Structures are given as structure tokens and as C-alpha cells.
Amino acid sequence: MKRYTRILLALVLGTGATAAMATEPCDDFGECKALIEINSTDGDIGFHFLMDGDDLNSARIDDPDGVKVFEDKAKGPLMEQKLTETFAESAEPLCWDDPDADEEDREDVVTLEDFLELWTPGTYLFTGKGDEGEKSEGETELTFNLPAAPIDLEFDGSVISWDVGDDLGNCADYDRLMDLVNEGVLPTHPEAVDVDSWEVVLEPDVEDGDPLGSLKFTIRVAGDTGLKEVTVPMEYLAYFDDNTPGKIEVGAIGGEDNATFTEVEICINEDVEGCEDED
């Protein structure tokens, strides 16, 4: 789920945001955020964070129990250049036993329950130090309020549409999520978690190294939008040949920036021949 390197063409109207976009200043830091991101289609889950400070030599994050979960120190030329914005994401293991996955991936499954047991909700402390030992501090909240996965993704050649879901796709179905709420593992069922915004992405599925691979359309729209659809500019679609394989992603972004994405394979500029089925 490398959506943080997307390039949004200048011709595309809207804002290309990322799931790790902090929503407010963070004390001494310009931004800081810790969040959970789920891909409901692939069925994987990860921890992401972002911090943005000024002229730092080192940066660190402690969880609500005071356990250090991340530390970074500048060395050599980076010590001269300094640290400012730091973003990272954990490995994203499968959260279900996917029968089509590699054997190694199936051995490393981390269920939703396992993941929530590993991480502690609450206040995460971000700290950084500069040349003279001056200290920057900021706090952000990690919650287990996980928005439900979008469903019914469609692309008609120019418009991407979707609907509101009620579970986490391959990571957990509705009934299992209800059990986790009743057991006190989850504070709220995902179907009841408010969506602050929807992140919508269209990207081609081309060979590695193909320049077209960086031409990705990304936009965010308000979570309370009544009409859940986005029109993709024709100027963007004109960059691709007929029958170019691609995919669309729609992410439900919660108030604490936790995000759940769903993706679907599509055919860009499809004609009567359609895209070849690689399967």
C-alpha cells in the first residue's frame, strides 16, 4: 500500500492527500500522527506515523505505556542537513489466511485481534532533539476506531463510485467485529465509525519502470458527501492507451485518520477487446 509516493498530475483538480496527513498542529511539532491502515481487499494491516519538526538531530516515539516504538538519529551529512518530516509504516502482514498467498506470508498472519493486542491505544509521545540539546515534544492519539471498508467500487470509464460498508473485508466480517466490540477489544463497530473523508485513487497497472506508473489520480472528498462518486478528468485518461490495466482504490478515513481501503481491478479506456486477463 505505497500510496505515499503518488504523483498527482497538475491537470487533475483536487488535493492529493495521504492517509497519514495529520489534521492539526502537534505542540512543538508542525504535525504528528499515529494511525492504523487496513487494506480490506488484500487483507493486510499496518501501523503508520508521521512527524514534522524543525532542524532535528534525532526523533523518537513512545507509546502510552512509555515503551519506545521508534527512534531515528541523523548521522554524517544528514546531521548537517537535519531531520524535518519523518514518515514510516510498519510491515503489513496478512490479517487472514489467504489460500492464494505465498506459504511464507500464510505463516506470518497477524489477525485483527493479534494486531490490536500488539499496539496500545492512547497518547503517543513524539520527541526530538536539536544541536544544543533543545527538545521538541508533541502528542497524538492512536485509537481503535476503525472505519468500515468501502464496498461496491465501480468504474464506468470516467466515474468512480462506491458505497458505505459495514465490516473490514478480509480482515474481519460483521459478526466477528460485533464479537470484538462485545469483548471490549474494539470500542465501536466499524459500521458506526464516522468517515471524515474518502480518498479515491486510480492508477495504471504497468511494468515496473514504466513512466506511466507514476501518473496516478488521487483526490479526497468530504465524508458526508451524499453522492459517492468522483469524475476522473478526461485529460488524465488521455495519457493511457486503450485497454490499459489499472485499479481503483477508495479509502474511508476516520476522524483520527485511521483508514480502511478497498481496491478493484479495472480496464482504462476499455474498448470492445477489453483488457487481457493475466490469470
Feature annotation, model-predicted:
Residues E134-A149, N258-D279:
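Short beta-strand elements
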Residues E235-I268:
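Beta-strand-rich modules
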Residues F47-M51, G157-A192:
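Conserved aromatic anchor
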Residues M1-A22:
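Gram-negative bacterial Sec-dependent N-terminal signal peptides
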Residues W119-T123, L227, D241-K247:
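Extracellular Ig-like/FN3 beta-sandwich strand-entry sites
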Residues C95-F126:
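Ligand-binding face of N-terminal immunoglobulin V-set domains in extracellular IgSF glycoproteins
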Residues T111-L116, T120, K129-G165, G169:
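Surface-exposed beta-loop interaction hotspot
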